[in-house]
Amino acid sequence: MMAVRSSIIFAQTSEVIGSEHTIIQSERQDGRFLSTYGVVHAMLANIEPECAFQPDMTAEEFREWQHKVRKSMQEIMKFPEVKDMPSPKRLYSKQRDGYKLEKWEFYPLPECVSTFLVLIPDSLRQPVPAILCIPGSGGSKEGLAGEPGVAPKLNDDYLNPKVTMARNFAKAGYVAVAVDNPAAGEASDLERYARGRNYNYDLVSRILLELGWSYLGYTSFLDMQVLQWMKTQSYIRKDRIIVSGFSLGTEPLMVLGTLDTSIYAFVYNDFLCHTQERALVMTAPDKAGIRPFPNSIRHLIPDFWRKFNFPDIVASLAPRPVILTEGGLDRDLDLVRAAYKMTGRLENVEIHHYPKYADPHSRTNIKALPEGLDRNEFYKLVNVDGANHYFKSELILPWLKKHLE
């Protein structure tokens, strides 16, 4: 009887929710909303980010804007001041085919020990460029290094070159340093016993938000410690350190790139999108009457949208070399190009699209996305081919060679 009743309720819900509810609009003459969702949606739509890139800036205004972006990033990332922590410690060194694999631990907070892997090419005879490698959702430093996970249930597809970012770099002659994202890989909780690589990022993110921090703030703080350690190693060229992020890893890449101007170049392996707009246009309810939210709470940073969006941050990296491997809307990518052109180094930005959208005529080319989208419709409009989302060494290694040799 309960199952029958549930089916009836579901059917009634489906009938009640018509296509007119995909667009958020007030039914009142004064434009106000009774629905709280309508209220907050309108509030978000009215936000103009303080640090939005303006293509008509002068060179001096551009430099001042970069400083404003950096200061704003410092404010919202909320890195703690921690002193007198122990120095990082090497746990082991093992020989692999063509490179040495080291494991290190470091102590970023009084409550925390974290680990990273270092891949050092056998061909090394003098200091060489080094790449900090940050995995995507569900990934681990072991997968990036071509190693089994710390437990069988945590194994990535670690022999697949579309996964082994750090190993690919080491094989090409660069030092590669691989980290875990918080709550994943070796930094996970009970996943190794049951749910495997379906990591519970959200639990950690909730607690960090309650502490007045954020998942991205915590992630970037840890990654910054590893970046600073890299600068102290005699076999690494400190003027040629690159940050490479895959998917989720592009977010700490943007933070590190904004805060540390000594980073030489960036590998952005994901599509670029305007995240505030993404939240505004994905409004289509499902059959149960539930509207989507673009991302989980591990992507939420208080005040982020009041400051900037992803294209603004990538634009602020100019004129340092950057490669974007999975496209997005030309509107957003052109904004990045404009920043590099403004600095006189347009050649320092290289942009690729998914092969499915390599032909400009196959891409959506609009100035503003329409409201009323579900997740699949959004991805289609922003030129994303999710089945081919992987680390694109075939594009990145030639680009590195061009900028490093």
Predicted features by range, described:
Residues 319-326, 350-352:
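Catalytic His-Asp charge-relay segment
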Residues 12-75, 375-383, 393, 397-399:
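N-terminal pre-domain segments of enzymes
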Residues 250-261:
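Short glycine-enriched nucleophile-adjacent loop
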Residues 203, 207-210, 264-314, 319, ...:
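Mobile cap/lid helix-loop segments that gate and shape the active-site cleft of serine hydrolases
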Residues 235-247:
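Alpha/beta-hydrolase fold nucleophile elbow
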Residues 342-405:
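C-terminal catalytic histidine-bearing segment of alpha/beta-hydrolase fold enzymes
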Residues 126, 132-221, 231, 279-282:
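Cap/lid segment of the alpha/beta-hydrolase catalytic domain
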Residues 75, 79-126, 130:
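N-terminal cap/lid segment of alpha/beta-hydrolase-fold proteins
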